[in-house]
Structures are given as C-alpha cells and as structure tokens.
Amino acid sequence: MRLILLGPPGAGKGTQATFITQTYGIPQISTGDMLRAAVKAGTPLGIEAKKVMDAGGLMPDEIIIGLVKDRLAQPDCANGYLFDGYPRTIPQADALKDAGVKLDYVIEIAVPDEDIVKRMSGRWVHLASGRSYNTQSNPPKVAGQDDITGEALIQRDDDREETVRHRLGIYQQQTRPLVDYYSSWAAQDPANAPKYRKISGVGSVEEIKARAAAALQS
C-alpha cells in the first residue's frame, strides 16, 4: 500500500495516517523526519540540507526528492509507505512522478473551511499537564478552567482563529491544486496514475476511519 494523504490543516490527517500505517504495517514518511535524520547522519544530502537550513533558505525540491528516494530504498518500505506532508506543491508532485515513485492511492480528506476553523480555534490546553479541551467536542466542565486543577486554560497561537484562517489560505494557494493534479491524472491515465479517492473528514474518528478503510479497498 503506497499512498499520499491530502487535506487541509486540522482535517485529521495525523489520526488517519496512524490508523492506516498500523493497519497495513507501513512506515509514515515525513520530510521533516528525513531531513533531521540525514543532517544527523551527515550524509551528502544531509550536508547540503544543513547548509540551506543554516542560511534560513527554502529547501530545494532536488534535495527533498533525493531524500525521498533514499528513504524508499530502505527495507521497511518494501510493503509500502504513506507520505505525510509531501508533496505540498505541483513541482514536488512532478518531481515525485519523474522519479518514478510508485503510488497506489491518493486520499483526500475533505472538511469545509468553517468546520476547520471551529475545530482548531476551539482548542484550549492546560500547559502544566498537557490536558487539552475543545469547546466544540470536548469542553471543560467550567469554561476556561482545567477540570482537575481549576487553573486557567490557554489557547496556543497556532490555534487562534486568525492563524487558522491564514494557514487555510496558504493551503488553498499551494496544496489544494494537488487535488486537481491527482484527480485529473487519475481520470486521464487510470492505468498509470494512483487511484484518487475523496472522503469526508466530518464525523467521529471511527466514522472517518471506516471511510478511509473503504476507500483503500475500492
């Protein structure tokens, strides 16, 4: 099983990625993890990547695709892999295609923007314990207070509504075009393209898991 998960921030990709990798016994391939591992190991690509990171630059696609190819050659990828947060742009998708990286499925988890805003901006945390709450799905017993200690809850900057809307805007500009890229490729060249499946990310975790499982059987 070789696949890409697509969807906006807050769509629940992480939860479904864990479910799929455990179900199929495949690794989750994260470009961030690959970069850190290559830099730590001092590989030729890692040395190049470190220079870019130290200069505060954007990582060139050639370095990323080189890391991807190295990672996919490792034994744990023999039965498949799940890409986490990659590709993010059309040039990255083209690089993956040109490198001959095999894919069976591209799964899009679709959630309306307003649902994402409610879901993410409703998150509040108790810093000392790490306990988290959501005003929509898991509210504290007393608004703004931790259930155990009664101490104040805080909202992380990443979860503020304006930040969430900004991240959704970046997703719509950069990553959303991948939905069209993979769906049109699947329609035009079904023999070679990965199967494109769209599932709703609205509902309980178990409902979405069932949709993901069904999509990977279809």
Swiss-Prot record:
Pathway: Purine metabolism; AMP biosynthesis via salvage pathway; AMP from ADP: step 1/1. GO terms for biological process: AMP salvage. Pfam families: ADK (PF00406), ADK_lid (PF05191). GO terms for molecular function: adenylate kinase activity; ATP binding. Its EC number is 2.7.4.3. It is found in: Cytoplasm. It catalyses: AMP + ATP = 2 ADP. Keywords: ATP-binding, Cytoplasm, Kinase, Nucleotide biosynthesis, Nucleotide-binding, Transferase. ATP binds at residues 10-15, 123, 132-133, 203. The keyword Methyltransferase does not apply. AMP binds at residues 31, 36, 57-59, 85-88, 92, 156, 167. GO terms for cellular component: cytoplasm. Catalyzes the reversible transfer of the terminal phosphate group between ATP and AMP. Plays an important role in cellular energy homeostasis and in adenine nucleotide metabolism. Belongs to the adenylate kinase family. Consists of three domains, a large central CORE domain and two small peripheral domains, NMPbind and LID, which undergo movements during catalysis. The LID domain closes over the site of phosphoryl transfer upon ATP binding. Assembling and dissambling the active center during each catalytic cycle provides an effective means to prevent ATP hydrolysis. This is Adenylate kinase. The lineage of its organism: Bacteria, Pseudomonadati, Pseudomonadota, Betaproteobacteria, Burkholderiales. The gene is adk.
